Amino acid sequence: MTNEEFIKQHRNENPLSLALKKVPEGVDMQWCLRQIEGYNIAKKKLPEWSEKENIWFPPKLSMEQCSSEATAKYKQAITERLGNKVLIDLTGGFGIDFSYMAKNMETAYYVEQQEVLCNIASHNFPLMGLQNTKISNTTCEEFWKQYTADDTTAKTNRDKCLIYLDPARRNDRGEKVFSISDCTPDVTLLQDSLLEHSAYIMLKLSPMLDIVQARRILKGIAEIHVVSVKGECKELVFVMSKKADEPHYYCVNLETDEESFTSPLSATTEQADIADPVEIAEGAIIFEPNASIMKAGLQNAFAKWKNLRKLHPMSNLFLGNKPIENIPARQFVVEQTSDFQKANLKSFMQDIRQANLTIRNFPSTVDDLKKRLKIKDGGDIYLFATTLSDDTHVLIRCKKI
């Protein structure tokens, strides 16, 4: 039996169970188990790749760290809009981002220091229909040194070149790091040369990164993309250019029907209108901006965009008169409100034993308030504990739209 036959026969089985079975003659069991494990991850994360026959998958860590198909396609859309024809991916990895961004390029350079990943890329890229790819098994710093030393190539490509980096976010001890200068490579040391020899740089960073800090460190920021998938913030993508003007934010929530929200950097200083407490009545709509908008700090700009009022200057809950289709926010219809006077609260809570509790600008933790209210998680009732513009603490009962 060949490795390929074994994988095809067993790829939907549990690799841990397979590891306990007798190894058929001619089968490299360790390699096959890695392929089966990778395939099972790819079915959800990379469906197009999982459907291709004979794709090779890397070790589990590389599978976990690679972009999802959804976020890779989003970056592909950015490159198509920018119109570049030469791609240089200085941190190739498994090659998911590279494979999508390279599709419409005249030339695409894949740079990776791990030989095993370069071998996998050499095997996989033709299967994914990629042409005109150049694979370099070296460090990004060494490749860049050699590339810029070739003055003819560097000058020819400069105005049509996009450089992509996804710096490793683990240190030598395998611990996660989040600041740009702690990642490998350290883009802060390379950015001047990268900007000089390219039309654009695209930089993928951790969703945990402080965007304000990144704006201070990085040069030539043209675009900041805050990328969520199904409500969870997954990536920050910075587009840099020596010709950059005022940066623009792009807040997206992939695999949903929500609108994208685009705004200039200056909008982060906008102030939203404040709701009168009497407006928070039965039938009013509460809006909670999605993770991308919250991460970008564009809550107030979002409110201005949709003519919403803020419940309190320090709150990130907003009020409207009616539901809004495809808005990048969760929406809830107000059913009832209560202050925290003992008698009022007792009456308000008398039929509630289970609810989804959210704390916003309120002097308590979720766990402490759940104990006080004697409720369990779950169900179809949503409770918001918050503070109104007159500094009254309230509990708002809602139904999700």
Please give the residue ranges for each predicted region.
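SAM-dependent transferase fold signal centered on methyltransferase-like domains
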Residues: 1-401
